[in-house]
Amino acid sequence: MIYRKWSLLSSTILIWGGAATAGLAGVFLFNAKEKFQKYLSGEGQRLRQQDRAAMGKN
């Protein structure tokens, strides 16, 4: 059997960890949290309106 320093699993964990770290850095450094919350709020409103319109048609 061949033993390597890095396996596919550990590299996947490393990639996801890096992405999570970059996301957290964006939230703390660039104050992206408020922008993201505003985006989610707008999307929620839009989806509620679509649901109401679809329910009204039935």
Swiss-Prot record:
- Compartmental location: Mitochondrion inner membrane
In which pathway is this protein known to take part?
A: Carbohydrate metabolism; tricarboxylic acid cycle
Q: Which UniProt keywords apply?
A: Membrane, Mitochondrion, Mitochondrion inner membrane, Tricarboxylic acid cycle
Q: GO cellular component annotations, sorted alphabetically?
A: mitochondrial inner membrane; respiratory chain complex II (succinate dehydrogenase)
The superkingdom of the source organism is Eukaryota
Q: How does it sit in the membrane?
A: Peripheral membrane protein
A GO BP entry? tricarboxylic acid cycle
* Quaternary structure (record): Component of complex II composed of eight subunits in plants: four classical SDH subunits SDH1, SDH2, SDH3 and SDH4 (a flavoprotein (FP), an iron-sulfur protein (IP), and a cytochrome b composed of a large and a small subunit.), as well as four subunits unknown in mitochondria from bacteria and heterotrophic eukaryotes.
Q: What is this protein called?
A: Succinate dehydrogenase subunit 8B, mitochondrial
Q: Which organism is it from?
A: Oryza sativa subsp. japonica (Rice)
Q: What is the lineage of its organism?
A: Eukaryota, Viridiplantae, Streptophyta, Embryophyta, Tracheophyta
Give the encoding gene's name: SDH8B
